């Protein structure tokens, strides 16, 4: 009775302080580790993420993996330092649990872990990456890897201090922006020269949202929300709002409440999601496309998701769009149940999925069938894992050279740093071409459907595809 998709390998880590799971689709797999807050159903969350990761990793050699852990005795979140300290300690425990049962490579030979009864074949490839809650933990993970003498060294967790910093590079958002630009080219709009309206999910301190909202100087961010605030700016001054978003991005731990209120256009403002209700000006009502003069925050969030804007840009955590025939329980994200909308209710022209699992697949299909332009999270935000894979492969390649004494660690690090721009270019090239391939496939004549049908049947017959899971015909 295990729900599909069934991973090829699963490691479950259990202790009085932490519980976690790591799912892999194959022997060579990669994906991030999430600090989950879903104590009751974190495996469901990780399973959904690994499903998206499997598709996302089509652009690289490793198949998808995903891990997640929950704290069992967490201090109150209000005590930030104690909460973070417990999170880091539990993260280390979780990683130790994974490495305790993972084979190592010593001088070219696979060495099974001590005190483990092993029934499987050699299986030493285990790499991890940052995800929600663990964005700054790569060095910690590589420290655990070093303690274990693990063969991958600092290639175990990509994106550390000696690696490609995704937020600094803005690589995930830049990859998603390739999808945005292509969608708008379909509409005859150049996002880099023409103003366009945006509704956003996230805030400027985040990697994917913060970097994304700085990728065009012509963004008119009219509404946005995160887990704390709702931001409304009905008629933003493009240049001044861009500069203010840049300031917030550079401000450590900023929130929408830090936005300079004097720069917000008439009828706008920043409102706490904890308010009982929010009064809406005529200007705010016009840009959101509603008539109600006052709404509770959750109803307002629902209205924002349905706003008649050019672009809905998701840089947040959660599933906000489903199909009309799906129930909230089927979606598996209780935190967003109260304001989730149907794909048929979206009024934006384009959806960009910088965040994972923002829509269910049926929700995407329903939105696309009514004329909306959307790819999937696996397409839009694949640049992050693509960049990590480049880093790990370069480190593995150079590891042997360093070990042989033909390259010092400092020389290796300098070489890695010097390749940053080139790696970024190669990754974005993948984003450009995979969206191009999808658009070409979409515009092919109907008579090629027979070939696509045969391809799907062949993929399914060779166990590379499950049409039911992917909601394919």
Predicted regions and their residues:
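Extended, well-ordered protein cores
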Residues: 1-129, 138-141, 154-161
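Non-transmembrane, aqueous-exposed alpha-helical and coiled segments at domain scale
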Residues: 77-78, 87-88, 99-121, 134-473
């Amino acid at each position: 009775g295990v729900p599909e998709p069934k991973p090829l390998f699963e490691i479950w880590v259990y202790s009085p302080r932490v519980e976690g799971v790591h799912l892999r689709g194959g022997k060579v797999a990669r994906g991030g580790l999430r600090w989950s807050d879903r104590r009751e159903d974190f495996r469901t969350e990780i399973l959904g993420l690994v499903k998206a990761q499997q598709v996302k990793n089509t652009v690289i050699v490793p198949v998808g993996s995903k891990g997640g852990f929950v704290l069992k005795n967490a201090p109150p979140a209000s005590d930030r330092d104690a909460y973070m300290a417990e999170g880091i300690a539990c993260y280390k425990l979780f990683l130790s649990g994974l490495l305790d049962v993972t084979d190592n490579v010593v001088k070219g030979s696979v060495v099974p872990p001590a005190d483990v009864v092993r029934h499987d074949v050699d299986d030493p490839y285990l790499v991890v990456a940052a995800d929600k809650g663990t964005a700054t933990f790569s060095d910690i993970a590589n420290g655990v890897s070093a303690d274990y003498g693990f063969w991958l060294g600092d290639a175990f967790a990509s994106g550390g201090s000696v690696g490609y910093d995704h937020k600094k590079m803005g690589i995930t958002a830049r990859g998603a922006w390739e999808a945005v630009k292509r969608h708008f080219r379909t509409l005859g709009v150049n996002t880099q020269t023409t103003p366009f309206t945006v509704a956003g999910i996230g805030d400027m301190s985040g990697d994917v949202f913060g970097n994304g909202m700085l990728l065009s100087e012509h963004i008119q961010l009219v509404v946005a929300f995160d887990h704390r605030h709702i931001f409304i700016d009905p008629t933003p001054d493009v240049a001044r709002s861009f500069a203010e978003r840049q300031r917030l991005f550079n401000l450590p731990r900023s929130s929408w409440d830090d936005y300079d209120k004097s720069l917000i256009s008439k009828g706008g403002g920043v409102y706490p999601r904890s308010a009982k209700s929010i009064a809406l000006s005529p200007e705010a009502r016009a840009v959101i496309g509603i008539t109600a003069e006052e709404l509770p925050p959750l109803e307002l969030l629902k209205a924002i998701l349905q706003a008649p804007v050019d672009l809905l840009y998701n840089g947040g955590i959660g599933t906000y769009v489903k199909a009309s025939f799906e129930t909230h329980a089927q979606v598996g994200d209780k935190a967003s149940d109260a304001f989730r909308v149907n794909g048929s209710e979206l009024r934006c022209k384009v959806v960009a999925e910088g965040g994972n699992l923002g829509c269910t697949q049926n929700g995407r299909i329903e939105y696309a069938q009514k004329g909306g332009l959307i790819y999937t999270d696996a397409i839009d935000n694949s640049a992050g894992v693509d960049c990590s894979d480049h880093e790990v492969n370069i480190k593995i390649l150079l590891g042997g050279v360093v070990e042989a004494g033909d390259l010092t660690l400092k020389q290796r690090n300098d070489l890695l740093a010097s390749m940053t721009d080139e790696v970024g270019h190669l990754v974005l090239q993948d984003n450009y071409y995979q969206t191009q391939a999808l658009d070409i496939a979409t515009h092919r004549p109907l008579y090629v459907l027979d070939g696509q049908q045969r391809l799907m049947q062949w993929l399914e017959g060779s166990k590379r595809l499950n049409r039911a899971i992917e909601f394919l015909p």
